[in-house]
Amino acid sequence: MGQKSNPIGMRLQINRTWDSRWYADGADYGRLLLEDLKIRKHIMKAIPQAAISKVVIERPAKLCRISVYAARPGVIIGKKGADIEKLRRALGKMTSSDVSLNIVEIRKPEIDSKLVAQGVADQLERRIAFRRAMKRAVQSALRLGAEGIRITCAGRLGGAEIARTEWYREGRVPLHTLRANVDYAEAEAHTAYGVCGIKVWIFKGEILGHDPLAQDRLMMEAQTSGVRPAR
C-alpha cells in the first residue's frame, strides 16, 4: 500500500539513501545514534530561519562529517564565516570526533518537500487560509519543474470545531512506482486552535537504474551549476 507507507523508506537503496551514513556495533551504536539526534536537534533549534531541509551525517574513521542542506546558507555562515565556526564548535562538544561542517545550498526550495511543508505550516500559524496556502505551494512547485505534487492538511482547519483532513493535488504522484523520485516530508503548525499536520509529496520524475545516491547527486549538481531558478 504505497499511500500508507513512507515513500522515502520504501525507496531506500533504490533511489534514496539514509541521512546517517556510518557503521558501528556494540555499545557504540546507541551512543552514535544519540549523538546524531542531538546534533540534528541543535542545528534545527539554533538556526530555524535558515530554511534547513535535512542534515546528513557521515562518520569516516575518527571524523564526523555533517552536511546541512539549506535554502538560505548565508544565515548559517554569517559575516566572514563567524556563525558557522561558532556552530562547528558547539557541535564539536557533542561528539568525541573531529567535526567537519559543510553547507549545501538548495537552489529550488519550491520543490523541496520539507521546505514546502514548513512553508505551509508557517502560513497556517499566521492565520492564512489553508486552501490558499496549499494552492500557492502547488502552483510554485509546478512552475519550478515538479511533475506532480500533493499536499494534505489535517486538524481544526480554519478554527472548525471538528477536525478534518483536506488535500490538494495537481499532476502525477505515483507512490507505487519504486523508480519514481518522490520527495516526502511532514510538518506541524501550532495554531490557536491546536496542532495541524501537513504532509507533502512531490514527484520529480523517474530515476532509472539502481542509484541510492541519486537525490544527493542531483542536488550537488544543481548547486555547482550556478543556474538559479526563474522567479
Swiss-Prot record:
Q: Which Pfam families match?
A: KH_2 (PF07650), Ribosomal_S3_C (PF00189)
Q: Which residue range or ranges hold the KH type-2 domain?
A: 39-107
* InterPro entries according to UniProt: KH_dom, KH_dom-like_a/b, KH_dom_type_2, KH_sf_prok-type, Ribosomal_S3_C_sf, Ribosomal_uS3_bac-typ, Ribosomal_uS3_C, Ribosomal_uS3_CS
State a GO cellular component annotated for this protein: cytosolic small ribosomal subunit
Question: Where are the disulfide bridges?
Answer: none
Q: Does the keyword Cytoplasm apply?
A: no
Q: Name one GO biological process term.
A: translation
GO terms, molecular function? mRNA binding; rRNA binding; structural constituent of ribosome
Going by the entry's taxonomy, the superkingdom of the source organism is recorded as Bacteria
Keywords (A to Z) from UniProt: Ribonucleoprotein, Ribosomal protein, RNA-binding, rRNA-binding
> Which NCBIfam families does this UniProt record tie to the protein?
rpsC_bact (TIGR01009)
Function, as annotated: Binds the lower part of the 30S subunit head. Binds mRNA in the 70S ribosome, positioning it for translation.
Subunit description: Part of the 30S ribosomal subunit. Forms a tight complex with proteins S10 and S14.
Q: Which family does it belong to?
A: Belongs to the universal ribosomal protein uS3 family.
Entry protein name: Small ribosomal subunit protein uS3
Q: Which organism is it from?
A: Rhizorhabdus wittichii (strain DSM 6014 / CCUG 31198 / JCM 15750 / NBRC 105917 / EY 4224 / RW1)
Primary gene name: rpsC
